Amino acid sequence: MPYLLEMKNITKTFGSVKAIDNVSLRLNAGEIVSLCGENGSGKSTLMKVLCGIYPHGSYEGEIIFAGEEIQASHIRDTERKGIAIIHQELALVKELTVLENIFLGNEITHNGIMDYDLMTLRCQKLLAQVSLSISPDTRVGDLGLGQQQLVEIAKALNKQVRLLILDEPTASLTEQETSVLLDIIRDLQQHGIACIYISHKLNEVKAISDTICVIRDGQHIGTRDAAGMSEDDIITMMVGRELTALYPNEPHTTGDEILRIEHLTAWHPVNRHIKRVNDVSFSLKRGEILGIAGLVGAGRTETIQCLFGVWPGQWEGKIYIDGKQVDIRNCQQAIAQGIAMVPEDRKRDGIVPVMAVGKNITLAALNKFTGGISQLDDAAEQKCILESIQQLKVKTSSSDLAIGRLSGGNQQKAILARCLLLNPRILILDEPTRGIDIGAKYEIYKLINQLVQQGIAVIVISSELPEVLGLSDRVLVMHEGKLKANLINHNLTQEQVMEAALRSEHHVEKQSV
């Protein structure tokens, strides 16, 4: 049986740089192939070639789809062939309804008039196909990210898709939403729809894939059956070296208590009847890594936003640093107390995309380069920028490059560099490795271990339980705004954490295995 897709010897250059160098990829109808590689490895470039974003003639090589050569000059050419791509940044219009988004550019008309009855009927069938029980008239902006992702798939199905490309589809989804999405992909597979799945979450890659293709530095490293590969095998192929331990387990000692929070309660910014954090108390020691785990909506981010002074609603409670009660109502007061934070959404809250990498790094510490006068010491600032880039291993062609052009991992390193310029005693990391590749994750994990060895206290909030358990000395478990457990991490398991989160009792338990 002929392949559904064959990409033969694809080479794509930008100037003198080969982004893709003689890469071949093939898959059958109904096959799920995961495309793995670090950020900058060439995955996105290869997919843009396939989809016609980079038109025929701008690359070398040949693309055969359903037995015919594709010479696309535009993405609409490949869509008409049955190839659809769903990017991590969803391409939905939030102000339009679900129906309007699904049929945008593909409206059903009779004599120039849109047939809303027929489109509604078709939309209902598409939504049922992706297990979405919502009205076609629902405004997309009122949906959660998981539901929006499914609307994107329904939109692709409306175009008679035969090959679906998913780029980091679960980066912002909950565990339950991820499970629903993977089930739908498997169902589409049963209907003969092939899928190219791109993700840094290797547990998902293993769970969903028939075949795994690895690209490194623009070159095809290998394609293997997923059943015969472990996560360690994938990592080794991706980074070109064996990572003996993803989570560095370097010994460090904890010191005296540096932070204590007592009876913290935070209310919804709009509805004062809803408590997002409910009577939470905990402490933190110097040189300790404190993980905070829980399902989405548990109140983890709200808790640390109160600590950093950026929670938009009202809150009450007491914060003690070095045994003294402090009042923190904005981020400037938090920074003055030695607290720095890497936010959950780096694109929205962490970077200024059009500003240079260097300027993003020094943004919160410009007073270091003024010397008491209003004029910046440009030489001192540039020296500090270059040292930070080197220390954090930020991969950029220039410190003047707009940070929005860097990979997610390098953006995250730049934000960390900014935090370290503040000489923090307490560092808060909210989803520190979301959407970044395995190599960048490893470097950030090593940095966290180095910081706690210097006595810096670190709070890690993560939706990935293996990350929380791999890094933390102690784990707080939250559920629906309440602290359910305070667990010392002596070989804690994911099952123990989830059991603690879902237990009906509200008292705090301690584990000292």
Curated annotation (Swiss-Prot):
Residues that bind ATP: 37-44
Catalytic activity: D-xylose(out) + ATP + H2O = D-xylose(in) + ADP + phosphate + H(+)
Cellular component per GO, a single term: plasma membrane
Keywords recorded for this protein, A-Z: ATP-binding, Cell inner membrane, Cell membrane, Membrane, Nucleotide-binding, Repeat, Sugar transport, Translocase, Transport
InterPro entries in the record: AAA+_ATPase (IPR003593), ABC_carbohydrate_import_ATPase (IPR050107), ABC_transporter-like_ATP-bd (IPR003439), ABC_transporter-like_CS (IPR017871), ABC_transptr_XylG (IPR013455), P-loop_NTPase (IPR027417)
Membrane topology designation: Peripheral membrane protein
Pfam families the record matches: ABC_tran (PF00005)
UniProt keyword Cell inner membrane present: yes
TM spans (from-to): none
Enzyme class: translocase
Chief location: membrane
Gene Ontology MF terms: ABC-type D-xylose transporter activity; ATP binding; ATP hydrolysis activity
PROSITE patterns: ABC_TRANSPORTER_1, ABC_TRANSPORTER_2, XYLG
SUPFAM superfamilies: P-loop containing nucleoside triphosphate hydrolases (SSF52540)
Subcellular location(s) of the protein: Cell inner membrane
The protein's Enzyme Commission number: 7.5.2.10
Domain of life: Bacteria
Boundaries of every ABC transporter domain copy: 5-242, 259-505
Family: Belongs to the ABC transporter superfamily. Xylose importer (TC 3.A.1.2.4) family.
Subunit structure: The complex is composed of two ATP-binding proteins (XylG), two transmembrane proteins (XylH) and a solute-binding protein (XylF).
Function: Part of the ABC transporter complex XylFGH involved in xylose import. Responsible for energy coupling to the transport system.
Name of the protein in its database record: Xylose import ATP-binding protein XylG
Species name: Escherichia coli (strain UTI89 / UPEC)
Organismal lineage: Bacteria, Pseudomonadati, Pseudomonadota, Gammaproteobacteria, Enterobacterales
Underlying gene: xylG
